[in-house]
Amino acid sequence: MIARFLIAAAVIGSTAIRPLDAQSRPSAVFDWFEYTGHDSVFDKMRPGPNEFQNPILAGFYPDPSIVRRGDDYYLVNSSFSYFPGVPLFHSKDLVHWTQIGSVLTRPSQLQLDSAGVSRGIFAPVIREHAGTFYMITTIADRGNFVVTAKDPAGAWSDPVWLPEIADAIDPSLFFDDDGKAYVVNNGPPVGQPLYSGHRAIWVQQFDVAGMKLIGPRKVIVNGGVDISKKPIWIEAPHIFKHDGKYFLICAEGGTADQHSEVVFRADSPMGPYAPGPINPILTQRHLDPNRPFPITSTGHADFVETQNGEWWAVFLGVRPYGDNLYNTGRETWLLPVRWENGWPMILAGNATVPYVLQRPKLPAESAPKIAMSGNFAVRDDFASKTLAPYWEFVRTPRESFFDLMSHPGSLTLSARSAALGTRAQLSFVGRRQQHIDASASTAMRFTPTKPGEIAGLVAFQTDDFNYLLGVTLVNGKRSVQLIERDGRVPNKAPITVVTAPIPGAAGATVYLKITARGDKYDFSYATEPGQWTTLKADADGTILSSKVAGGFSSNFVGAMFGMYAYSP
């Protein structure tokens, strides 16, 4: 069933966003946008009574962090250079999640000017203490900060920067039961690194009242579980207390197919920490990559204890469609944590991450209006005065470029001079591709008035890797055109793949559709509803994968489908 909704996003503060003279530029009007995803694995592995389906957040929702207050659970993810930043979800059963907004909704909180798509916000962590919620995170190349809120669904504070850990990433907060607090983070090792990927985990006390770090800063893990094996990228640390002991969990191995989760234990938050007898406590790196419906790259976990005393882990994982290729990005998964001989274990031995398993022992919620797992379809008729919370922009907006009021029941985008292929803040409103087999379609009215003007649908991975299916002017005729950007070609020049004239009146509605089928994408158009003409079939979808679009060491995002408008 298609979900139709009137869910309002957090209002984006107008401070520092300039009004745009819409009369000076053409506009594209989108009457609706429909996303449909249908992966065969979700048909083959359907949850039964008292079961749930993984991933709990399908698509590009990596680096999950979770917290409980009472019987309410809140979860955040990395957003990199998309705005609003840090999507925020709520659940009461750990299975059904509803996005209630984003943490960083104002330009004063998040400045992403000219940032690469995989820079921006890394690994946010959400915690609650004494009635206040805290979100601590890294903004790549700029440092680390904390924001706070009494109500996580409400407005969050402006950032409080932590200059003491300017060289760090992945900070996490731990509030001890004696009233003290600590920040633990990834940072460079003491002295010169011994090998590529050599990192360390540091800890320092945090003054909650002063919102600053105090006291000595200390390395508690050097390299990883066993530095003699040259482990890489020990990161994403979190400290928990259980039965009087302090547990440190970290990701190790880099966020690709060698990813894992490891654990250490100490008698004090400041250490010393000893690795557990069985490490890693979660990985899939030793399994056959050609197994059916593989889940790989698992790690970057966070733990939560339910009100019933159960422990659960959220973590990232990916669903490749072949040869370590995936366009859906790193997704959020849920598994129980077992305590064995005083140590936590998520998944041992050759066990595979299950798509279906028994639900937590919590009162079941009804399915959310907008599904986040399994197969589903979502249609936005733009009937609300605000955008739904899952819509994203590329980088922080500095001028108004869209509205929902000038054409009620439609989304209007101003065709500005911010172009695909640059690090500009585009006239782009997009949502995640959440399935390997998916489609995005829209109905658009756009009348280009000069060569170069174009508006339509984009399949977007990065500035240098994307497809644009748009309406433009070619030899004085309104035409539909497919433009490919493959950053591997010389000068990263865009390629016009195919062009076709559009029959009918200049201002008539054009329907556009992008269909993903694993590594193949089809691009279609119509002038009447449902009467699709294929403009291009079997286009190379691997350019929208993390592996091709930069590689796993520099590309951390998934593909987006979105609406776009441009005028030179």
Q: Model segments located where?
A:
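Bacterial N-terminal signal peptides
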Residues: 4-16
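Sec/Tat signal peptide C-region and signal peptidase I cleavage site
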Residues: 18-21
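Carbohydrate-active catalytic/glycan-binding domains of CAZyme proteins
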Residues: 23-568
